[in-house]
From Swiss-Prot:
The active site is at C82 (nucleophile), H170 (charge relay system), E172 (charge relay system). Keywords: Glutamine amidotransferase, Hydrolase, Lyase, Pyridoxal phosphate. The lineage of its organism: Archaea, Methanobacteriati, Methanobacteriota, Methanomada group, Methanobacteria. HAMAP family: PdxT. This is Pyridoxal 5'-phosphate synthase subunit PdxT. The keyword Hydrolase applies. It comes from the Archaea. It comes from Methanosphaera stadtmanae (strain ATCC 43021 / DSM 3091 / JCM 11832 / MCB-3). It catalyses: aldehydo-D-ribose 5-phosphate + D-glyceraldehyde 3-phosphate + L-glutamine = pyridoxal 5'-phosphate + L-glutamate + phosphate + 3 H2O + H(+); L-glutamine + H2O = L-glutamate + NH4(+). Pathway: Cofactor biosynthesis; pyridoxal 5'-phosphate biosynthesis.
Length: 192
C-alpha cells in the first residue's frame, strides 16, 4: 500500500485529496492519502503533494518544521502545483526559502495577479488537458536534466526532474486525473 501525503497548510488541500483518491481508485492501486503538517506526519508517506498558496509562507513552514531538510534528505517524490512548483525550483525572482530539487528558475505570478487568472486547453505530456491558471508562475529557465511536460504560449508550465514534478497550474480543480496518475506512477516506482 502507498500513502500520498498532502501538505495541509494552504491551497486546495481537500481538492488534491479527492482527486488523488479518485486516481488511486481508477488505477486500482491500494493506496491512501494523508494530510501532512509536521515531520511526524510525513514519516509513513511515500510521496508528497505541495499545493498552491503563498510560496514564501509555505517555504518558511517547511524550514521551521524540519520538513525541508527531510524532503531533501529522503528524496521522496513530490508533486508541486503553483506555489509548490516555485518551492521545488532552485531559483525564483523573489528572495525566499526553496527546496531546490528541480534545476529551474521560476517567475512567481508570471502570468499576472489574481484578476489575470485564466483557463486554457493545453497539451500535457502530449495529452489534451484543461489548465486552470490562478496567479500562475512559469518556468523561465531549466537545465538539460529537466524534462518539459507542458508549455503555454511558449512558456514552460510543467516539468519533471527525477522523482519531482512541478506544475504551474491547478490540476486539482479539474476532474481530470492525468497528472495525479503520473505522480502516483512515480511514487510507485520509488517504493522499495
Amino acid at each position: 500500500m502507498i500513502t500520498i501525503g498532502i501538505l495541509d497548510l494552504q491551497g486546495d488541500v481537500e481538492e488534491h485529496q479527492i482527486i488523488t483518491e479518485k486516481a488511486l481508485k481508477e488505477m486500482k492501486i491500494d493506496g491512501t492519502t494523508k494530510l501532512v503538517n509536521t515531520l511526524d506526519d510525513i514519516k509513513d508517506c511515500n510521496g508528497l503533494i505541495i499545493s498552491g498558496g503563498e510560496s514564501s509562507t509555505i517555504g518558511m513552514h517547511l524550514e521551521k518544521t524540519g520538513l525541508s531538510n527531510y524532503l531533501k534528505e529522503t528524496g521522496i517524490p513530490i508533486l508541486g502545483t503553483c506555489a509548490g512548483l516555485v518551492l521545488l525550483s532552485k531559483k525564483t525572482d523573489q528572495d525566499q526559502p526553496l527546496l531546490g530539487l528541480i534545476d529551474s528558475t521560476v517567475k512567481r505570478n508570471g502570468f499576472g495577479r489574481q484578476r489575470m487568472s485564466f483557463e486554457s486547453e493545453i497539451k500535457f505530456n502530449n495529452e489534451d488537458y484543461h489548465g486552470i491558471f490562478i496567479r500562475a508562475p512559469y518556468i523561465s529557465q531549466i537545465s538539460d536534466d529537466v524534462e518539459v511536460l507542458s508549455k503555454y504560449d511558449d512558456k514552460i508550465i510543467a516539468v519533471k526532474q527525477n522523482q519531482y514534478i512541478g506544475i504551474a497550474f491547478h490540476p486539482e480543480l479539474t476532474e481530470d486525473t492525468l497528472i495525479h496518475k503520473l505522480f502516483i506512477l512515480e511514487v510507485e516506482s520509488c517504493v522499495v
